[in-house]
Protein backbone atom coordinates (compact mmCIF):
# COMPACT_ATOMS: atom_id res chain seq x y z
CA UNK A 1 0.00 0.00 0.00
CA UNK A 2 1.59 3.26 -1.18
CA UNK A 3 1.07 6.16 1.21
CA UNK A 4 1.33 9.80 0.16
CA UNK A 5 2.08 11.73 3.35
CA UNK A 6 0.74 14.99 1.86
CA UNK A 7 -2.85 13.64 1.94
CA UNK A 8 -2.67 12.97 5.68
CA UNK A 9 -3.60 15.29 8.52
CA UNK A 10 -1.92 14.90 11.90
CA UNK A 11 -3.26 15.70 15.35
CA UNK A 12 -1.17 15.79 18.53
CA UNK A 13 -3.34 14.03 21.11
CA UNK A 14 -1.07 14.28 24.13
CA UNK A 15 2.31 15.63 25.15
CA UNK A 16 3.82 14.26 28.34
CA UNK A 17 6.77 15.54 30.30
CA UNK A 18 9.04 13.21 32.25
CA UNK A 19 11.42 14.60 34.85
CA UNK A 20 14.65 12.96 35.93
CA UNK A 21 16.22 14.54 39.00
CA UNK A 22 20.01 14.61 38.84
CA UNK A 23 22.65 16.21 41.05
CA UNK A 24 22.67 19.41 38.97
CA UNK A 25 18.86 19.83 38.86
CA UNK A 26 16.07 18.41 36.75
CA UNK A 27 16.33 16.89 33.28
CA UNK A 28 13.17 16.98 31.19
CA UNK A 29 12.22 14.64 28.37
CA UNK A 30 9.01 14.72 26.36
CA UNK A 31 6.78 12.16 24.73
CA UNK A 32 4.12 12.87 22.12
CA UNK A 33 1.10 10.83 21.04
CA UNK A 34 0.06 11.66 17.47
CA UNK A 35 -2.80 10.41 15.29
CA UNK A 36 -2.57 10.65 11.48
CA UNK A 37 -5.35 10.04 8.96
CA UNK A 38 -6.48 10.92 5.45
CA UNK A 39 -10.21 11.22 6.35
CA UNK A 40 -10.85 8.47 3.83
CA UNK A 41 -10.49 5.23 5.79
CA UNK A 42 -6.79 5.27 6.66
CA UNK A 43 -5.71 6.11 10.21
CA UNK A 44 -2.72 5.41 12.45
CA UNK A 45 -1.13 6.48 15.70
CA UNK A 46 2.42 6.81 16.96
CA UNK A 47 4.41 7.61 20.08
CA UNK A 48 7.65 9.58 19.98
CA UNK A 49 10.10 10.46 22.74
CA UNK A 50 12.82 13.12 22.71
CA UNK A 51 14.52 15.87 24.70
CA UNK A 52 12.54 18.55 22.83
CA UNK A 53 8.81 18.64 22.00
CA UNK A 54 9.14 19.19 18.19
CA UNK A 55 11.53 16.24 17.92
CA UNK A 56 9.12 14.04 19.91
CA UNK A 57 6.24 15.05 17.60
CA UNK A 58 8.31 14.32 14.48
CA UNK A 59 9.26 10.87 15.82
CA UNK A 60 5.61 10.20 16.72
CA UNK A 61 4.45 11.12 13.19
CA UNK A 62 7.07 8.80 11.68
CA UNK A 63 5.91 6.03 14.03
CA UNK A 64 2.24 6.70 13.14
CA UNK A 65 2.92 6.12 9.44
CA UNK A 66 4.30 2.67 10.32
CA UNK A 67 1.03 1.76 12.11
CA UNK A 68 -1.62 2.71 9.55
CA UNK A 69 -4.81 0.64 9.36
CA UNK A 70 -7.71 0.57 6.90
CA UNK A 71 -11.14 1.27 8.41
CA UNK A 72 -14.28 -0.13 6.77
CA UNK A 73 -16.60 2.88 6.57
CA UNK A 74 -20.22 2.27 5.54
CA UNK A 75 -21.44 5.56 4.09
CA UNK A 76 -20.77 8.11 6.81
CA UNK A 77 -20.78 5.68 9.73
CA UNK A 78 -19.64 2.17 10.71
CA UNK A 79 -21.37 -1.10 9.86
CA UNK A 80 -22.14 -2.39 13.37
CA UNK A 81 -21.71 -1.84 17.12
CA UNK A 82 -18.35 -2.79 18.54
CA UNK A 83 -16.87 -2.79 22.01
CA UNK A 84 -13.14 -3.18 22.57
CA UNK A 85 -10.89 -3.21 25.61
CA UNK A 86 -7.21 -2.34 25.71
CA UNK A 87 -5.63 -2.57 29.18
CA UNK A 88 -7.99 -0.66 31.51
CA UNK A 89 -9.59 1.42 28.74
CA UNK A 90 -12.77 0.28 27.07
CA UNK A 91 -14.40 1.93 24.06
CA UNK A 92 -17.93 1.45 22.76
CA UNK A 93 -18.64 2.46 19.14
CA UNK A 94 -22.17 2.58 17.71
CA UNK A 95 -23.30 3.52 14.20
CA UNK A 96 -25.43 6.66 14.01
CA UNK A 97 -27.90 8.01 11.45
CA UNK A 98 -26.77 10.65 8.99
CA UNK A 99 -26.56 14.14 10.45
CA UNK A 100 -25.74 12.97 13.99
CA UNK A 101 -22.10 13.99 13.80
CA UNK A 102 -19.17 12.63 15.79
CA UNK A 103 -20.16 12.16 19.40
CA UNK A 104 -16.85 11.22 20.98
CA UNK A 105 -14.86 12.51 23.88
CA UNK A 106 -11.21 13.03 24.62
CA UNK A 107 -8.65 10.97 22.76
CA UNK A 108 -11.16 8.93 20.72
CA UNK A 109 -12.40 11.96 18.73
CA UNK A 110 -9.28 12.65 16.62
CA UNK A 111 -8.99 8.95 15.70
CA UNK A 112 -12.60 8.82 14.49
CA UNK A 113 -12.47 12.16 12.65
CA UNK A 114 -9.19 11.34 10.88
CA UNK A 115 -10.57 7.92 9.87
CA UNK A 116 -13.27 9.76 7.90
CA UNK A 117 -16.26 8.68 9.98
CA UNK A 118 -18.85 11.47 10.10
CA UNK A 119 -21.70 9.96 12.15
CA UNK A 120 -20.95 7.82 15.21
CA UNK A 121 -21.75 7.47 18.89
CA UNK A 122 -18.88 6.54 21.19
CA UNK A 123 -18.44 6.04 24.89
CA UNK A 124 -15.10 5.72 26.63
CA UNK A 125 -15.28 3.57 29.75
CA UNK A 126 -12.68 2.77 32.37
CA UNK A 127 -9.27 4.42 32.18
CA UNK A 128 -8.91 7.70 30.29
CA UNK A 129 -5.18 7.24 29.66
CA UNK A 130 -4.81 8.85 26.19
CA UNK A 131 -2.53 6.12 24.79
CA UNK A 132 -4.86 3.32 25.90
CA UNK A 133 -8.01 5.08 24.60
CA UNK A 134 -6.40 5.76 21.19
CA UNK A 135 -5.14 2.17 20.99
CA UNK A 136 -8.55 0.73 21.99
CA UNK A 137 -10.30 2.93 19.39
CA UNK A 138 -7.90 1.96 16.59
CA UNK A 139 -8.13 -1.74 17.52
CA UNK A 140 -11.95 -1.50 17.54
CA UNK A 141 -12.04 0.25 14.13
CA UNK A 142 -9.71 -2.38 12.65
CA UNK A 143 -12.10 -5.16 13.78
CA UNK A 144 -15.15 -3.72 11.99
CA UNK A 145 -16.40 -6.06 9.29
CA UNK A 146 -17.53 -4.47 6.02
UniProtKB/Swiss-Prot annotation:
Cysteines engaged in disulfide bonds, as pairs: none
Subunit organization: Part of the 30S ribosomal subunit. Contacts proteins S4 and S8.
Any one biological process term the GO annotation gives: translation
Pfam families, alphabetized: Ribosomal_S5, Ribosomal_S5_C
GO MF terms, alphabetically ordered: rRNA binding; structural constituent of ribosome
Species of origin: Wolinella succinogenes (strain ATCC 29543 / DSM 1740 / CCUG 13145 / JCM 31913 / LMG 7466 / NCTC 11488 / FDC 602W) (Vibrio succinogenes)
Keywords tagged on the record: Ribonucleoprotein, Ribosomal protein, RNA-binding, rRNA-binding
UniProt gene name: rpsE
Domain comment (free text): The N-terminal domain interacts with the head of the 30S subunit; the C-terminal domain interacts with the body and contacts protein S4. The interaction surface between S4 and S5 is involved in control of translational fidelity.
Cellular component aspect of the GO annotation: small ribosomal subunit
Residue ranges annotated for the S5 DRBM domain, each copy included: 8-71
Primary role: With S4 and S12 plays an important role in translational accuracy.
NCBIfam families: rpsE_bact
Family classification: Belongs to the universal ribosomal protein uS5 family.
Lineage: superkingdom: Bacteria
Protein name: Small ribosomal subunit protein uS5
Amino acid sequence: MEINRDEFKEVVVNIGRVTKVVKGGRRFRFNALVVVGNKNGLVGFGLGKAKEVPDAIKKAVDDAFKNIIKVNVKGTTIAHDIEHKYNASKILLKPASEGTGVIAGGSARPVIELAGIKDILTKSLGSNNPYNVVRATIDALSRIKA
